[in-house]
Amino acid sequence: MIVTNDFVDDVNNIHPKDKQTAGLRFANLALYQLYHNPTKLSPNQVFSPEPIVPYYGKPNEVYVNFFYAEKLHSTTKTIEGFELAGIDGVFYPAKAVICEEQSTIKLTSAKVKKTTQVRYAWKNTAQPTLRNEYNMPATCFWLDDIPVGIVEDIE
């Protein structure tokens, strides 16, 4: 899967006008997956999020680590599109901060005390702003069944 909604100029039309960028992303993905020919963009076509249980005694925080992603950054001042839900299943916008090692995002929401679900760019008109070092956008995702609980502070 590749992401194309980051360069769509009309969110009501699923066919991007920029066919060259879409074609290049598909070609790099094929080279990597079918022929194991690593190009600098190939493993970065899809960010693979993995939830990390909230920790350090703060149940309203959740960390999402992105494999195949280094030097995460946003194309806008704030990272938009992350949402958190608690046990009630109601999603609220989350504040997203890139952690120091630049492959993990810290998410918080004052309205969610114990996070059980995380989603990113989960809207028909979403245009992802989170990018990796090759300026490839993160894919939309929905992580559910995040264990409710806190891992003790490890020092």
Where are these regions (language model features)?
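Conserved, well-structured interaction surfaces
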Residues: 1-23
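Generic beta-strand/beta-sheet core signal
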Residues: 2-4, 67, 121
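Short loop/turn segments at secondary-structure transitions that flank enzyme active sites
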Residues: 7, 32, 124-126
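Structural beta-strand/beta-sheet cores of well-ordered domains, especially the beta-sheet scaffolds
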Residues: 12, 60-62, 103
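Non-catalytic, well-ordered alpha-helical segments in soluble enzyme domains
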Residues: 18-36
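Surface beta-strand/loop "capping" patches
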Residues: 32-78
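C-terminal beta-sandwich/jelly-roll accessory domains of carbohydrate-active enzymes
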Residues: 70-155
